[in-house]
Amino acid sequence: MAEQRGNMLMKKYEMGKLLGQGTFAKVYHARNTETSESVAIKMIDKEKVLKGGLMDQIKREISVMKLVRHPNIVQLYEVMATKTKIYFVLEHVKGGELFNKVQRGRLKEDAARKYFQQLICAVDFCHSRGVYHRDLKPENLLLDENSNLKVSDFGLSALADCKRQDGLLHTTCGTPAYVAPEVINRRGYDGAKADIWSCGVILFVLLAGYLPFHDKNLMDMYKKIGKAEFKCPSWFNTDVRRLLLRILDPNPSTRISMDKIMENPWFRKGLDAKLLRYNLQPKDAIPVDMSTDFDSFNSAPTLEKKPSNLNAFDIISLSTGLDLSGMFEESDKKESKFTSTSTASTIISKIEDIAKGLRLKLTKKDGGLLKMEGSKPGRKGVMGIDAEIFEVTPNFHLVELKKTNGDTLEYRKVLNQEMRPALKDIVWAWQGEQPKQQQQPTC
């Protein structure tokens, strides 16, 4: 068996100490015995990934990682697999998080500019290859032994965990302090423009030593982000203020582009020309060890389809009483959400019974999506309803009901007069309403 034997993995990597772990993966320090190079190995539990419905996403993301070879991006060296595990062999970045520096005090302007230049060049490189990060945050900004910035988790977001450290700049798990207004809004967004916003928040933090959008009241902080309400400290010079106003523009259509940022005089001061000249075409593809059961990515026994896992921001955005879209635009009233302490199988069974009673054709899709369709056309065609189940914890789920076709009034009538009463036994709370009991769900 090619899997880990003792301290050796694939007869090539000497495994070291555990560096961290999350829901799907553990990360170990390791040494390549052929080159003596220090690496990090992310060991992923294939069964958990399959149950979470994330295998296709991981395979797509492995392919995109071939496109993102850049000196300021944590490198994926190799992908291997066995019948039970997937292994990502990654560059080991030894300098820790950039924000550990900021916790000791704000950075001088030249130092902040250097890191911002490296960040922008790395992110722009990925954008040029059609890859967007969408989750730039403190944990993803690392430093190597030469104090150069390294952006991590490009292309590996499916395995990102929401666990964060407490501290000056690490906000509560899921707090969208670095997230663009349009992402909070959940109405679809341009990945490039969302990344630009996050880069602006990071620049502010480097120069100020604190977040631009912060409030003890979470909802007030959401509002500040939505309106881009922030104040620059007195030590910010005019050029930085102007640049930040262009980056932290709540309207993505008028927000500054990467090209314009890179033309900005403040940005270009002292810029290392090698960053701009970096060859965008990688010379080598990432080696994938096909002899170690990579083809068995899909060969595991058939598993019950489980609902999608929500990341922490999704939980906050979708959970009871926190419908954020109303802060930015009028709701079209086509969707409703409720939370439940029932198991996923119980929720699915209940929805199947409701669909049968309403004579709706029900189709199960991957990741906890149930599609229902009427048998007869109504005023605006055949009514279509999606029910999507998200796992917050094994004992707590969020369900989103959404009209996908047909007349809105007809849908609201079916929802309020038929579906809601039938769902009452499994509903903990409908979004915007108080839970039927004050008992908190088990997390």
Curated annotation (Swiss-Prot):
Sorted keywords for this record are: ATP-binding, Kinase, Manganese, Nucleotide-binding, Serine/threonine-protein kinase, Transferase
Q: Which GO terms describe its molecular function?
A: ATP binding; protein serine kinase activity; protein serine/threonine kinase activity
Task: Write down the EC number.
Answer: 2.7.11.1
Known InterPro entries for this protein?
A: Kinase-like_dom_sf, NAF/FISL_domain, NAF_dom, Prot_kinase_dom, Protein_kinase_ATP_BS, Ser/Thr_kinase_AS
Return the Pfam families for the record: NAF, Pkinase
Q: What class of enzyme is it?
A: transferase
Q: Where is this region: Activation loop?
A: 153-182
Which Cys pairs are S-S linked? Answer: none
Q: Which residues form the Protein kinase domain?
A: 13-267
Query: Where does the record place the catalytic residues?
Result: 135
Q: Give the cofactors, semicolon-separated.
A: Mn(2+)
Cross-referenced CDD domains: CIPK_C, STKc_SnRK3
**What residues does the NAF domain cover?**
302-329
Q: Where does the record locate the signal sequence feature?
A: none
Specify which residues bind ATP according to the UniProt entry for this protein: 19-27, 42
- A GO BP entry: signal transduction
Q: Which reaction does it catalyse?
A: L-seryl-[protein] + ATP = O-phospho-L-seryl-[protein] + ADP + H(+); L-threonyl-[protein] + ATP = O-phospho-L-threonyl-[protein] + ADP + H(+)
Q: What induces it?
A: By drought stress and abscisic acid (ABA).
Taxonomically, the superkingdom here is Eukaryota
SMART domains (alphabetical): S_TKc
* Stretch list, region PPI: 333-362
| Similarity field | Belongs to the protein kinase superfamily. CAMK Ser/Thr protein kinase family. SNF1 subfamily.
Q: What role does this protein play?
A: CIPK serine-threonine protein kinases interact with CBL proteins. Binding of a CBL protein to the regulatory NAF domain of CIPK protein lead to the activation of the kinase in a calcium-dependent manner.
Share the domain note from the entry.
The activation loop within the kinase domain is the target of phosphorylation/activation by upstream protein kinases. The PPI motif mediates the interaction with the ABI (abscisic acid-insensitive) phosphatases.
User: Know the name of this protein?
Assistant: CBL-interacting protein kinase 2
User: What organism does the record attribute this protein to?
Assistant: Oryza sativa subsp. japonica (Rice)
